[in-house]
Amino acid sequence: MAKTDIARRVYNHAWKLDPIVRSLLDTDFYKLLMLQMIWGLYPKVDATFSLINRTTSVRLADEIDEGELRAQLDHARTLRFSKKEMIWLAGNSFYGRKQIFQPEFLNWLHDFQLPEYDLRRKDGQYELHFHGPWSHTTMWEIPALAIINELRSRAAMKNLGPFSLDVLYARAKAKMWSKVERLRQLPGLKISDFGTRRRHSFLWQRWCVEALKEGIGDAFTGTSNVLLAMDTDLEALGTNAHELPMVLAALAKNDEELRSAPYRVLQDWNRYYGGNLLIVLPDAFGTAAFLRNAPDWVADWTGFRPDSAPPIEGGERIIEWWKSRGKDPREKLLIFSDALDVDTIEETYRHFEGRVRMSFGWGTNLTNDFAGCAPKEIEGLNAISLVCKVTDANGHPAVKLSDNPQKATGDPKEVARYLKFFGNEERVEQLVRV
């Protein structure tokens, strides 16, 4: 892959529009896996996705020009999957499986276009919503977040000259490489890039992926970014996300359907994929409730991704549950992915070493850690906690509780109803930075 002078590219403002998202493959792999299942099983379900800025002190509408945001969103809507991309999706092996994507699905995907968006300003923030069929709106999540985060980075750097930009990126590269050198000291480490949605920029994410590939070799297992996986000959990684149980819960007609929603998702998933993709995401409505009500067959799955509890606490809870179901944790897999940086990776690795198989999905602190890198402090370069979540399904409000109350989303009355139904035990309040 040709090298790019990122600082020079940032400084060059000659073009009218420098597209942030240039391919529909510039997304997380699990969006495509989920999309195929949504297309196959829930074609008549409508779902709204909405931007949520959890860092409320940052007024996005004051930092990002509305015209530039609309131009980037409009450009993303012009994209289609290319012939090369379709051939790669059809012919490549993913998770050891050939033709993981059905020919009928790929025929449908060939003409896919991102749906229209609804954008307005309110109290210094952007209200951004995507309405329509679930099989269309789900694909806005990653590009919308990538666009807003990169526009914020560009706005923060717009007054920096070539020399200051050189210093900024030189320091960021040195900071990133020092993390790589620490990761080298962890034998048997398995780590992947999960940093697309809140990255500093596409070019920076690509550099970070190349640095990991060069610096830690086989310990770097791949990237969630499908375009980068294709371009750099890496494994495309990812399983499923909270939106699946959130939508099924929103559609529930009674208490039994609500209670069983997280497990019906897993049954659907097993029908479509199975094998190495049998990873449980347990925290949509609280991990404690999930484990308490889980059918025995859940313990047969490959592993869990504890996504919102502190990693050591969350991992220990799942290990104890496996033991209670007669399973040997050393044969199971834990994938840690919540707000990780090198300190928490080292601590978690050393805590669980030899007790369970581990993998780490490194996100925002991999692809957007510029704190202290500019010649003078620039607040706009600090990563924020920005998400794009499903907020209703067929007109019914969607809710996520999480193991961290700070990450709960949904109408407050519905959140209270879900808490009463699923329980509030073992949820731990933590500051959300990214």
UniProtKB/Swiss-Prot annotation:
EC number: 6.3.4.21
Key word Phosphoprotein present: yes
Superkingdom per UniProt: Bacteria
Catalytic activities: nicotinate + 5-phospho-alpha-D-ribose 1-diphosphate + ATP + H2O = nicotinate beta-D-ribonucleotide + ADP + phosphate + diphosphate
Gene Ontology BP terms: NAD biosynthetic process via the salvage pathway
GO cellular component: cytosol
PTM (free text): Transiently phosphorylated on a His residue during the reaction cycle. Phosphorylation strongly increases the affinity for substrates and increases the rate of nicotinate D-ribonucleotide production. Dephosphorylation regenerates the low-affinity form of the enzyme, leading to product release.
Pathway where this protein functions: Cofactor biosynthesis; NAD(+) biosynthesis; nicotinate D-ribonucleotide from nicotinate: step 1/1
GO molecular function annotation: nicotinate phosphoribosyltransferase activity
Pfam families with a match to the protein in the record: NAPRTase, NAPRTase_N
Role description: Catalyzes the synthesis of beta-nicotinate D-ribonucleotide from nicotinate and 5-phospho-D-ribose 1-phosphate at the expense of ATP.
NCBIfam families: NAPRTase, PRK05321.1
HAMAP family cross-referenced by the UniProt entry: NAPRTase
Name recorded for this polypeptide: Nicotinate phosphoribosyltransferase
